[in-house]
Each structure stands twice: as C-alpha cells, then as structure tokens.
Amino acid sequence: MKQLRKWISAVLVLALALSLCACIRPEPTEPAGPSQQPAQPTTEPTVPGPVTYHYEKTDQRVIYDHVIILGVDGAGGFFTQADCPNLTNIFSDGAITHTATTATPSSSAPCWGSMLLGVSPDVHGITNDSGLPRDGEDFPSIFMAVGRAFPDAKLASYVHWPNINTAIIEAREDLPIKKVSSLPDQYIASKGAKYILENQPKLMYLHFDDADAAGHSDGYGSAYHLQTLEKIDRYIGQIYQAIIDAGMADSTLFIVVTDHGGTPEGKHGGDTAAEMQILFAVNGPSIMANTEIQLNIQDVPAIVAYALGIDQLDTWDCVLPDGMFADIPGGA
C-alpha cells in the first residue's frame, strides 16, 4: 500500500508539471541580427493583389509630399524574365526602363552610393569594404538635402545590408533618420509598411537583398534568381499597399530601382550588359504615362529634388531624364 501511494504521488506530480509547462508560452523573439542566421519566413506577405491604383494624371507641376524608393539589390534588368504582377500594375501608367545604366564598378556600395549621393564611384570613393560612418560634408546624400530643406520631415532608411546606413547615408545628430539595418527582406517589407502607415515619411529608402544572394548562389537569371524576384514583387506590392492605405498615393513619387545585375556564373562588378543594365521604374500623378526612359543611377537625386520642389545640391552630378515629368516633357 505504501508503494502504491508513492506511485500515485509521483504520477500526480508529473501531471502537474506537464500542465504547468503547457501553460507557459515562450517569449516572442526579434528577427536575427547580422551575426546570426536569419530564420526562414514561414509565410508570404498578405497582399490583396496584385495591387492596382489609377492616378489622375496631370501635365501641371506637382510638388510631392513624399518620395518612397525601393532598392532591389542584384536584380539588374531581370524582372522582365519573371512573373511580377505588382511591378507591372503599379507602373503600367508610369515611366519604366529595364536598361538604365548603373555605376562602374557594378557592385553594391559603389552603385547605391552613386544613387544616394548623385556622383560617380570615382568621386565618392565608397566601396563594399567601406564601413565607417560619414558626416556627408564632402558629398551630401539625398537625405541631407531633404532633411535641410524640411527640418521637421520624417526620414527613414530600412536596409538589409547595414553598410548603406553607415558608410553611405550620413550619421549626424542634426539629421535625424530612422535607420533599421540587418533585417531579412520579409521584415524590411512588413516593418517598412508599418512605418509608412504610422509616419507618412517625407523620404524613405527600403533595400531588399535576397535577389543578390540568389544570383550569387545559383547565377543571375537562374530559376532561383527569378523566383526570388517574384517574391520581392510581393514585397513591392506590400509597400505600395501601405502607401495607398496611408492616404499617400496621390502625393507620393514611388520609385523601384536596382543597383546591378550579374552573370550566369554568379558574378558582378564588370561592364557587361547583364551586369550594367538595371531596372528603374517611377510613378506619380505628374509622371508621363506609358513612357520608357533612359537614365544613369546617379540621376536619382535630381529626380527626388525636383519631385519635392527643392534645389539640387552643388556637389551632385545628375540630370532629370527626358520625358519623365509631364510638365517638362523634353526633360531638363
């Protein structure tokens, strides 16, 4: 009988312990940092899409309240080979090219540096190994130009690759920028969309990196690379839907741009067409409909400045592309 009581007591203790464990929920975890292996997304973004929005086009001068730029690392001009309904729908009445020219060398830091600073890599000197913070006094970025023109404006940069937020975009106490770095692309999209909804930023840059990783892994233009572009197309739709939901669409210039392409062998940095040709797409009320444009990646600051109604900086070496804005159909 004594042994039976011990056995019953042990069973009761075990049952109690199991019930307590079942009631304890694990604490939620933040996305992995740059030194950790990021968790693989278990779900795709929920987008009621493909996203469609029809602008009331005008040939009058429009001063935009917002500019949102999506940078897709390593996508080059390969979107034409993938099924990307959001990209197609959003820019169906906008201006787009899949053969814009990137900077030389066709690597991430030189190219994103030229896009954000408005000068060529041989001038700004930023490489993939650059990591130290810069104050931007030598070559100010579009963030400094916009921040000084609109001191109370909300500025944000959400990037997978942290060097963009350290070595390219300024780090200054007098230039408050909401910077988020080292997140997987899925979180760049979800957290970026949330920020847009809650803050309606004047200028925001979002950087997606999965396409470049896929290109290095399986080759640029490979099935895996193109599948990754299709996934990023859903992120593009997610961000654009946030712009619509925030009531910003009619006052936002929306840009999608890539930095470089690559070879079937998974390389880039050279001057072949596969490495140098990139996507540039833009839409807004004053963007000429169904227009194919040509530009260099370092012309982006001129586009941003014109859209927001501010002067270009003297350090910039960039021009407005011909036929982009309806009020200046011949360019500037």
What are these regions (language model features)?
Residues 77-111:
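Short, structured active-site-proximal loop/turn typified by the sulfatase FGly-forming signature C/S-X-P-X-R
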